[in-house]
A protein has these predicted regions:
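Short amphipathic beta-strand/extended segments with alternating polar/hydrophobic composition
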Residues: 74, 225-228
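ABC family nucleotide-binding domain
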Residues: 4-210, 214-217
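Short, low-complexity, intrinsically disordered N-terminal peptides in bacterial proteins
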Residues: 1-2, 228
Length: 228
């Protein structure tokens, strides 16, 4: 099987004061279509930095990332932005919804940015809201929803343009245990059904059971299972 996403020897260093901070140290990984991979590590281990680089939001100091055969370091900034909008979906711990827009409008935001025609956009949004179980909440605004419902909206929005890659950074961090497991189970089902690849960063070991594979990150480097 040819990997959908490849990261090769990725390193990233930040300078804070007079001291360099090695956020990532020679990280290599592959993500396959239809696969949900958990990225497990403590706060500060480099999870968010790795997601930002894999998603094209940041550039590595060394190494490269390849998405669907395209090397990100060879793309212009405009091409990288286009790739992010069309092929990468992001889900964040804080949901990132626009409070003054309805649920329907929030899910449709990335499709408006890609200039989808109105009829196609509305059909896609309706389909996604049914998929995540929020058809009855289409005209609600985010503040009227529970945390779990808001994260379902965020997942629907991330999947709106049918991206090849889904990146989720602590998507259950603001949810209670039961709701978090429901959200991850939904994410798992959607990834398997859509054929996208997903990389989910978490510090919660309880979510590992929903992953097809688990990667452990410690001090910016991938390591074996620390509990083994």
């Amino acid at each position: 099987m040819s990997a959908l996403v490849v990261a090769e020897n990725v390193s990233r260093t930040f300078v804070r004061g007079a001291s360099p901070v090695h956020a990532l140290r020679g990280v290599s990984l592959e993500l396959n279509a239809g696969e949900l991979v958990a990225l497990v590590g403590r706060s500060g281990s480099g999870k968010t930095t790795l997601l930002n680089i894999v998603g094209g939001l940041d550039r590595p100091d060394e190494g490269e990332v390849i998405i669907d055969g395209r090397k990100l370091n060879q793309l212009s900034e405009a091409a990288r932005q286009r790739l992010r909008r069309e092929q990468v979906g992001f889900v964040f711990q804080s949901f990132g919804l626009l409070p003054f827009l309805s649920v329907r409008e929030n899910v449709g935001v990335p499709l408006r940015m890609l200039r989808w025609r109105t009829r196609a956009r509305e059909a896609r949004v309706t389909e996604l809201l049914a998929t995540v179980g929020l058809s009855d909440h289409a005209e609600h605004r985010p503040p009227e929803l529970s945390g779990g419902q808001q994260q379902r909206v965020a997942i629907a929005r991330a999947l709106a343009p049918s991206p090849h890659l889904l990146l989720a950074d602590e998507p259950t961090g603001q949810l209670d245990s039961e709701t978090g497991q429901q959200v991850i189970a939904l994410l798992q089902r959607l990834v398997h059904d859509s054929g996208s690849a997903a990389l989910v960063a978490t510090h919660d070991p309880a979510l590992v059971s929903f992953a097809d594979r688990v990667l452990y990150l410690r001090d910016g480097a991938l390591v074996g299972d620390p509990s083994a």
